[in-house]
Amino acid sequence: MKNLLSILLIINYHFAFSQEKKYPQDYFAPPMDIPLYLSGNFGEIRTNHFHAGIDIKTQGVEGIPIKSAAEGFVSRIKISPYGYGKAIYVVHPNGYTTVYGHIQKFSETIEKYIKAAQYKKESFSIELFPMSSELQVKKG
């Protein structure tokens, strides 16, 4: 019985700690060329939910250009009067996805892509899922 219990504990220990995932240390670059000060942290308690990202202060300036934290492709674009407002999702080769929300303006290429879809749908609110070859982005 002791041997069986020991074996079960070892197996349980293996499965519990083999789930630990190493995240890349120097893979991602800052998304803006300003000092990064946070106004909202991941997981902080909001009125009816936990905050699902980090909010970066923009020194009171609107329209600061946002850069992709790493190379990848735009996998989702969502424009809504709620939530993130204008948001873009970038999938990176390492399997991570970065989300950029509360965006004032997209790049010219992405703006044209969105506007064409909005006119086609005849709606400001839109959710798009571009193919991986359509909107490639580079780090920075």
Question: What annotation goes with each model-predicted range?
Answer:
Residues 100:
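A cross-family detector of function-defining hotspots
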Residues 18-87, 91-96, 104-109, 117, ...:
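Surface-exposed, glycine-biased beta-strand/turn segments
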Residues 1-24:
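Bacterial Sec-dependent N-terminal signal peptides
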